[in-house]
A protein has these predicted regions:
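ATP-dependent carboxylate/acyl-activation modules
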Residues: 1-69, 103-138
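Short Gly/Thr/Asp-enriched flexible loops that form oxyanion-binding sites at enzyme active sites
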Residues: 77-88
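Short, acidic/small-residue loops that bind anionic groups at enzyme active sites
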Residues: 88-104, 122
Length: 138
């Protein structure tokens, strides 16, 4: 499938690329009062199709109330993930609030792709975490 998805007992889906980035994002989220519903590591072989499939799985999890994305483009370009999100929005797969920090390879292009979407882009992961925790605690 090109990704690993682990279910937890919170209400925020965490998406990242690479185990280290995903784990540190989970720690930061927990430290700021958030609870992960699942974490998705899109890995180094992600395609638009595999990320779309993962978003479909996340959208079917009843406890998920928001999505937090922390990507650093390298092997996997951030535009690959942005394309999957745009398709998921078009197909009404993702109707949850999405908060994202995108850096690295093609991140400026992916931010441009997502600027008119429902995704709320942040300049840092700390900002994205604060926004998602505030959304959940409304």
């Amino acid at each position: 499938s090109g990704f690993s998805l682990v279910e937890l007992d919170g209400n925020i889906a965490v998406i990242g690329n690479g185990a280290g980035l995903v784990m540190s994002t989970l720690d930061m989220l927990t430290d700021n009062g958030g609870k992960a519903a699942c974490f998705l590591d899109v890995g180094g072989t992600a395609t638009t199709e595999s990320v779309y499939k993962a978003l479909t799985l996340i959208s079917n999890m009843r406890n998920v109330k928001a999505v937090l994305v922390n990507l650093y483009g390298g092997i996997v370009k951030t535009t690959t993930v942005a394309s999957a999100f745009l398709k998921a929005y078009d197909d009404e797969i993702i109707i949850l609030p999405v908060f994202a920090r995108l850096m690295g390879s093609e991140s400026e292009k992916s931010k441009e792709m997502l600027k008119d979407s429902e995704t709320q882009l942040s300049g840092s992961i700390e900002e994205a975490i604060n926004k998602v925790v505030m959304e959940i605690n409304k």
